[in-house]
Regions:
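Core nucleotide-handling region used for phosphoryl-transfer chemistry
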Residues: 1-216
């Protein structure tokens, strides 16, 4: 039976996000998150990648075109893709290639960082992601805040992390807010949004033409 390949939804900017491109979409306000239990994670500067139970992977585009920086991941996914149920897919950031921000990882395996599990039209809750990563020896994107949505607390958590990384000579792109609980894919924009820091350089064309590896 063939498996349907599905593009990951577009993430809208929070209204207080500091950096946008011309084709980005922005929420009119953040009222949808009021009273919501959320998980806030670091927004990593990599390639959005979807993994299926049969080991097939694709980036945001569904054209199936492969690139050299995806080759290691195509082999690595066989370590865990068998743990995905029928109708389930795993989404993570492929950080093998350096984009605008360079990273240094303890191992090459850490350059794939999970941020979503989707099954039969629903984004699974955050604890399911943590469990899947624990059982399969995977790394998920770092959590900087968890609790009732509070803009001020979230921004403070981000600034604290930004300062911590700066002291280590590292940069940070921004953060992603998501509902801690399960929600339907059809309502993605009601449950997920992003913040990108000021002056984050968008260099997709450049990094592909002269790409280099991150450090492992």
């Amino acid at each position: 039976m063939s498996i349907e390949r599905i593009k990951y939804p577009r993430t809208f900017h929070l209204p207080y996000s500091q950096s946008r491109t011309d084709d980005d979409k922005t929420l009119p306000d953040d009222s949808q998150f009021e009273g919501m239990n959320v998980v806030v994670t670091i927004k990593m500067d990599g390639e959005n990648t979807t993994v299926y139970p049969d080991g097939y992977i694709h980036a945001r585009s569904l054209d199936g075109h492969g690139y050299a920086w995806q080759n290691w991941l195509k082999s690595y996914v066989w370590k865990f893709c068998g743990s995905l149920m029928e109708g389930e897919r795993l989404i993570g950031e492929n950080l093998y290639a350096k984009h605008s921000i360079g990273y240094k990882f303890d191992s090459i395996e850490d350059s794939f960082q999970v941020f979503a599990l989707i099954c039969d039209g629903f984004f699974e809750n955050w604890s399911d992601i943590e469990d899947f990563c624990l059982w399969n020896g995977l790394k998920h994107v770092e959590v900087i805040y968890k609790g009732i949505y509070d803009k001020d607390k979230i921004i403070q958590a981000f600034e604290n992390k930004k300062k911590e990384l700066a002291e280590q000579g590292q940069d940070i792109e921004g953060f992603v807010v998501r509902d801690e609980n399960e929600f339907p894919t059809s309502e993605f924009q009601k449950h997920v949004a992003k913040f990108v820091r000021a002056n984050h350089v968008q260099t997709d064309k450049h990094w592909r033409e002269t790409w280099t590896k991150n450090e492992f």
